[in-house]
């Protein structure tokens, strides 16, 4: 409320102008309706009675109206009455008493009453119709006119009716919104921050998959899906640290050399803008070593890890002879070979968690499990799980398994009627899956249904690169956008939801003291704008999202309710691991990491200061006499059990991930290498000639004294080669050119 004189003047002028304009329209409407009313009466009378009856009835009612004044008229008028071709002359008294004239008057009156009622009803209907038409036209002038783009609705039932009318509604629903029939093979993308509701959508889709008996491969990072869906009678779990883990056999899974190459590509991800020589070489060595071990009757994961990491470089060179990897461990480039093995250690050490799972029952392969799909009965699920404590250590193995499952879909043969679901929440928490970019566009022909959850599109770009991320995102047709707190990500989501093109209405008033100056002008301007603003995305509550369907259907603002599911199985059951084997492998890994740190120092520029050179030579003096005696100690195999040697646990292995330094280049000639003899003389105390840690306390004391900051430095160097940051355009993986 405002008592300001200016506001009152403006409001009064506008109100007065509106009343005047309304009066003009009302007068025109009433005038037209009045004329229309009498026209209707005349038409009804013309249809209802004859002309003779109408004239005679009019004469009768005329005489009736003049009956009170008849005595005042000196000369009584005479009326000519028509009666079927004859003419009779009557005065007023005769007209009023003649039965025929009375009948004509009654007929005229009854016809007039009927005509009036009919005309009034028609006029009222006409009034409302005209008012509605005028109001509709006025509303259209003041409303925006949509000319293109996508629409937005907050009522999913409206879209459900549209889909049902088109015959495209599916039995799969997300809340009250059905998806388009058979669009599940066109994949799903769930985009939004943590805790916004992506997992709830996955649960809704998983419920339908379980009801229909579809085959499902699900990446369960927290064990929530194992807890809610695991059925031990038909389902399988792949988690090296879970007692229920299937006895996965690498050598039965990979039958050919390309199979081992594909496995190595995921197990050892390619670096960022660093020289890809190191990761590529590590891939080659792993693939060739695993392939050569396929015919070994005593093959095992622990033996594979020993072969790659424990034996001397000379023995590894002998094992890989006559293979493409032999050139990478040549004696001429032994220092480079040691550095390559240091890189290999960082990723292959995840294989050590598989030691012992071959005793968990019959050998299991993902390929054979997927080929066993049945369309006449319910199929099982494959849970590839981990938890927050172990995910960093198991990340290479989990990524490898999921990549094998994705490739395994193609081995099942084309079948558009089959449904194989891949649920992968928080996809960027895995290594880059190289085959995903190429397989995802073709998976629909094999019945593949991919449901990926990501916190932001930027994560996808960081892992897969700009072009590959765009390719992946483009083949995910059904999308749900949950809350995104940051401006750029929310703006991206708003742009993906869509925009509309419309003519925006505008209205302007002009008024003054003279009514001639009063007026209203309206107009429309072409405008394009997003359906929702980035602020709308930022302010979405939990379990609320915008859903876009493929095709000409509106975007839907959808609100879900959390549906609790009963716990049907423990999310995690720890597996008993051989402590002696684990301790021995931990010692091997520690030795390889120490070796990697030694090699990293060889790839650093020489120190110009004489004082630093003297300091670098100091460790040789007190420990040198003891080095030759270390390998001959009889207690050497029991060293991992000494209390001075810390044994890394299976669950908490994150610290060892940062212990290997990865050289930034792959051209040995460009690096200043130290003489081999000097390297051998500089072995720290506690390290044998074979590179094994035999006295951890002495080695740690030497490291703390001489290299107090090397661990932090090596950790930063290692993190460079893990997919944390990516410069766009530097990706060398296949599929990036899409």
Swiss-Prot record:
Region (Disordered): 607-690
CDD domains, sorted: TrwB_TraG_TraD_VirD4
GO cellular component: plasma membrane
Compositionally biased residues, Low complexity: 618-646
Repeat positions for Sequence: 617-619, 620-622, 623-625, 626-628, 629-631, 632-634, 635-637, 638-640, 641-643, 644-646
InterPro entries per record: P-loop_NTPase, T4SS-coupling_protein, T4SS_TraD, T4SS_TraD_DNA-bd, TraD_N
MF annotations from Gene Ontology: ATP binding
Stored Pfam families: TraD_N (PF12615), TrwB_AAD_bind (PF10412)
Region forming the signal peptide: none
Topology with respect to the bilayer: Multi-pass membrane protein
TM ranges: 28-44, 113-129, 396-413
List of residues binding ATP: 192-199
Localization in the cell: Cell inner membrane
Subunit structure: Interacts with relaxosome component TraM. May form a hexamer in the membrane.
Reported function: Conjugative DNA transfer (CDT) is the unidirectional transfer of ssDNA plasmid from a donor to a recipient cell. It is the central mechanism by which antibiotic resistance and virulence factors are propagated in bacterial populations. Couples the transferosome to a type IV secretion system. Probably forms a pore through which single-stranded plasmid DNA is transferred to the secretion system. Plasmid specificity is conferred by the TraD-TraM pair.
Family from the record: Belongs to the TrwB coupling protein family.
Protein's name according to its UniProt entry: Coupling protein TraD
Designated gene of the protein: traD
